Amino acid sequence: MKFFVSCAKGLEYLLADELSALGLEKATATIAGVNAEGELEQALRIVMWSRLASRVLWPIDAFECPDEQALYDGVRALPWHEHIKPEMTLAVDAHVSGDKITHARFAAQRIKDAIVDRMRDEGLERPSVNTDLPDVRVNLSLRKGRASLSIDLGGGSLHRRGWRGAAHEAPLKENLAAALLLRAQWPRLHAAGGGLLDPMCGSGTLLIEGALMAADVAPGLMRHGSLPPSRWLGFDKAAWKAIQSEARDREAAGLAALKPVIHGSDIDPTAIQAARENAEVAGVAHAIRFTRADVADLAAPEQEIGAVVCNPPYDERLAADPALYRALGNALQKAVPQWRASLLCGNDELAFATGLRAGKKYQMFNGALECALIICDPIAVPGRDPAQPRELSEGAQMVANRLRKNLKKFKSWRAREDITCFRAYDADLPEYAAAIDVYEEDGGQRRTFLHVQEYAAPAAIPENDVRRRRNELLAAAREVFGVPPEQVSMKSRERGKGGSKYGRFEQRDEFIVVRENNALLQVNLFDYLDTGLFLDHRPLRRMMAEQALGKRFLNLFCYTGVASVQAAVAGAASTTSVDLSATYLQWCYDNLALNGQGGNQHLLVQADAMAWLEGDRGQYDVIFCDPPTFSNSARADDFDVQREQLKLLRAAVARLAPGGVLYFSNNFRRFKLEENAIAEFAQCREITARTIGPDFERNARIHRAWELKRLG
């Protein structure tokens, strides 16, 4: 059976690894969770043992749901007497997206109404509603007009361990705490005799979770006690009892062997008292030493190796003071220089303030707050005085300040639209003339890469000044984003030798996977001038994907096929991708395969797009045409978009099905559309403003775009 295990964003790949370790043969990371496949007993084992999951959702039905009446009818059609008894209590959680049903509470209420009405149809009493502790919790996911109904096997969020009492300010959810511990490699270090330290421990969440992890205590034991987590009629009570019995045996052995190698301190006595009380309830107080101390007075533990895990203050209620982060970094370098640190910082600027060199950085979310998790191993870099912060030159500091300003400006937009690849800087300071694009890896090590494109400097600028400014810009970018040199690609936008538009740069042949508009994509940041993903077209691709459901999609001059892939993921009936380059078509094929989009409905055509259009007789509902400005391939006629626009657009419009739309775009800055001639065969309107994202507003001429429809 296929089922879904949800988690906080940023934990997906850790969760997939955890589920594999729990015995699942198929566990594939996706947005905010993992698509799993296994038996009910395995799903119940996840409820008991997962430290990272939020919910385990066991499907009971799925159906097309174009509107609220279809939702009600689909739910009412189910035999609910097979899932819940009249005397039981019920709760419904709903997650909706789309333009037909937009309110989750309304959807949940309609589901409750349908369940109650179906029970009455069966001559049964209606079950009561209990949103806090229901006997059965039903979950709805409504996406792209399709409703999926599941039983929440855990009965609620699995981050609750059952030990938390008095919570101090800004408590960390336990499953996020587990992620910090796993990124710190705490299980490995504990097995090797290492210690665990949190110098700003608050109410003790990280240390208590670390102690339970070290003692092999199942997260679900205290949460559920002796009762099953759900009274759903399909729940396997015998399997749960066996899982519970095994967990109790492992808990007894683990707690008996747990040694006092865990250290926590905080300047707030109230926090220390809350931490001690929580540790007592969790049964691990004997393993944790809590002390009241300022971070500046941090003492060195007796263990030679170990992990530091810390969640310094950064939310709106607790002022995020860079000086506090600097004090934390200095204290760690002095007390535990050879340990490994996993620090959850509020943002890149605060991570930079620690003065620590991060080997890896991950994007995570503490509730709605986007955070930067930095991994430092070792904490202190040999040969560097920990008391001396890395200083930037005056020019580099200007660039760094502008980058931080831009990141702050983009933060809410990026969170709202799930943007992980974007332009952070575009010659904002004229003397530092370059574009800096950020690519956040999806999966793998979840590294952050920078793609820096330096614009050609005027001949009057001395070469020494060009080199100095380039180095200052790179230094600022690396500091702000906390990336090592090998994750920075530096290129010049000058014309290649021999007039070639695309010159070969490094020979790394290194692809990373990123995500845009719900699609996974391969990019190559080092080998070519362009990366395989034109970031400026992001809004236009999203627009087309939103229209693609059940449609026939044609992508002319398709490049690496990103628009085709996103249309396929969005539910296009078919995609046709045309390009003269076999390299790009293979790239497109790989991108489709990466998203599980194969089959004859996704056609790849190696051909000159102009010639192919003249011979094709197919009809398409959505066409994307993004031609190059110039092309002089040996296998096709020379192409000039200004000269060939009428021929190209006439042929493309002729392939539109009734009601179809053609999106035409190009980045030739001196391009002039022949509007009067086009008006003879198409309705045409410019939509450029709708296709420029916030990160390209500084360079609104990056491209232009039009929407064309057949006359009549």
Swiss-Prot record:
It catalyses: guanosine(2445) in 23S rRNA + S-adenosyl-L-methionine = N(2)-methylguanosine(2445) in 23S rRNA + S-adenosyl-L-homocysteine + H(+); guanosine(2069) in 23S rRNA + S-adenosyl-L-methionine = N(2)-methylguanosine(2069) in 23S rRNA + S-adenosyl-L-homocysteine + H(+). GO terms for cellular component: cytoplasm. It comes from the Bacteria. Its main location: cytoplasm. Its EC number is 2.1.1.173, 2.1.1.264. Keywords: Cytoplasm, Methyltransferase, RNA-binding, rRNA processing, S-adenosyl-L-methionine, Transferase. It holds the Pfam family THUMP. Gene3D superfamilies: 3.30.2130.30, RNA methyltransferase domain (HRMD) like (3.30.750.80), Vaccinia Virus protein VP39 (3.40.50.150). Residues 42-153 form the THUMP domain. GO terms for molecular function: 23S rRNA (guanine(2445)-N(2))-methyltransferase activity; RNA binding; rRNA (guanine-N7-)-methyltransferase activity. InterPro entries: 23SrRNA_methyltr_KL, DNA_methylase_N6_adenine_CS, RlmKL-like_Mtase, RlmKL-like_Mtase_CS, RlmL_1st, SAM-dep_methyl-trfase, SAM-dependent_MTases_sf, THUMP_dom. It is found in: Cytoplasm. It is an enzyme of class 2 (transferase). Specifically methylates the guanine in position 2445 (m2G2445) and the guanine in position 2069 (m7G2069) of 23S rRNA. Belongs to the methyltransferase superfamily. RlmKL family. This is Ribosomal RNA large subunit methyltransferase K/L. The gene is rlmL.
